[in-house]
């Protein structure tokens, strides 16, 4: 079984067959998961903001989500996300598969009662799969590496914050760093493909409208999911079916 974690629109795009909605109790809380099949492959999908879309980024229970996936036998987790572009030269919409991230603020961990230090990062195998698939089938420009800067949310960033972080990163979002950290702590492989749906605050001389960002993300989510579906098939063939 392969895990998929997506944003607010993933469950609106009907990709799963034989869907079973389930709630899994974990040591970190309850996770809601849709289990089903994509092209005959067993997958487990989590909507990171909850079925009711009522969990803002700073309140997502990443530990419960990833622990629940692991309890189902998932070893590989592919994320989908929406990010703001930190480079004026990027065209919109684009896809970016980040190779690293900066997350100074979330502090997420499963190790609250023990002293354990992991070396965080995205899984390079999954990243390479996403890059290969995106280059082959995406109709969007593909940015095959970049640094993802995670802010706490739920508010958007100030112009001053963007002016600072654009020196260190290529895109800005609110969840992928936390997901990558928890995945690594639980021994799961994780990488993410993101749609660039807007320019971050101050990158271009234009106002930022959250409702417009949401609409753009919804429009572009299908392209992102197309990549994820093909990546799921490739991971299944190369890493699961052969074992």
From Swiss-Prot:
Q: Give EC number(s), comma-separated.
A: 2.4.2.1
Residues binding substrate, per UniProt = 174, 198-200
Q: Which InterPro entries does the record cross-reference, listed alphabetically?
A: MTAP, Nucleoside_phosphorylase_d, Nucleoside_phosphorylase_sf
Please verify whether the record's keywords include Transferase. Answer: yes
Pathway note = Purine metabolism; purine nucleoside salvage
The terms under GO molecular function for this entry are: S-methyl-5-thioadenosine phosphorylase activity
- Enumerate the residues marked as the site Important for substrate specificity: 157, 210
Q: What class of enzyme is it?
A: transferase
Q: Which GO terms describe its biological process?
A: L-methionine salvage from methylthioadenosine; purine ribonucleoside salvage
Assembly:
Homohexamer. Dimer of a homotrimer.
Q: What else is known?
A: Although this enzyme belongs to the family of MTA phosphorylases based on sequence homology, it has been shown that conserved amino acid substitutions in the substrate binding pocket convert the substrate specificity of this enzyme from 6-aminopurines to 6-oxopurines.
To which protein family does this belong?
A: Belongs to the PNP/MTAP phosphorylase family. MTAP subfamily.
HAMAP family reported in the protein's UniProt record: MTAP
Functional description taken from the UniProt entry: Purine nucleoside phosphorylase which is highly specific for 6-oxopurine nucleosides. Cleaves guanosine or inosine to respective bases and sugar-1-phosphate molecules. Involved in purine salvage.
Task: Tell me the protein's name.
Answer: Probable 6-oxopurine nucleoside phosphorylase
């Amino acid at each position: 079984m392969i895990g998929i974690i997506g944003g607010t629109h993933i469950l609106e795009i009907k990709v799963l067959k034989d869907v079973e909605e389930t709630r899994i109790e974990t040591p970190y809380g309850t996770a809601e998961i849709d289990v089903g099949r994509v092209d005959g492959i067993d997958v487990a999908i989590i909507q990171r903001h909850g079925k009711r879309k009522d969990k803002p980024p700073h309140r997502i229970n990443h530990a419960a989500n990833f622990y629940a996936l692991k309890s189902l036998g998932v070893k590989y987790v592919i994320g989908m996300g929406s990010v703001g572009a930190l480079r004026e030269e990027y065209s919109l919409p684009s896809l970016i598969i980040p190779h690293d991230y900066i997350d100074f603020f979330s502090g997420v961990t499963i190790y609250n009662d023990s002293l354990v230090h992991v070396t965080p990062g995205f899984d390079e195998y999954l990243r390479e799969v996403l890059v290969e698939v995106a280059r082959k089938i995406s109709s969007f420009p593909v940015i095959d590496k970049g640094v993802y800067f995670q802010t706490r949310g739920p508010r958007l960033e100030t112009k001053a914050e963007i002016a600072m972080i654009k020196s260190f990163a290529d895109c800005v979002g609110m969840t992928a760093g936390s997901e990558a950290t928890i995945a690594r702590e639980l021994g799961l492989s994780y990488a993410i493909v993101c749609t660039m749906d807007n320019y971050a605050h101050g990158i271009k001389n234009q106002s930022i409208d959250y409702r417009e960002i949401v609409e753009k993300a919804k429009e572009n989510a299908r392209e992102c999911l197309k990549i994820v579906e093909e990546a799921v098939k490739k991971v299944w063939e190369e890493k699961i079916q052969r074992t």
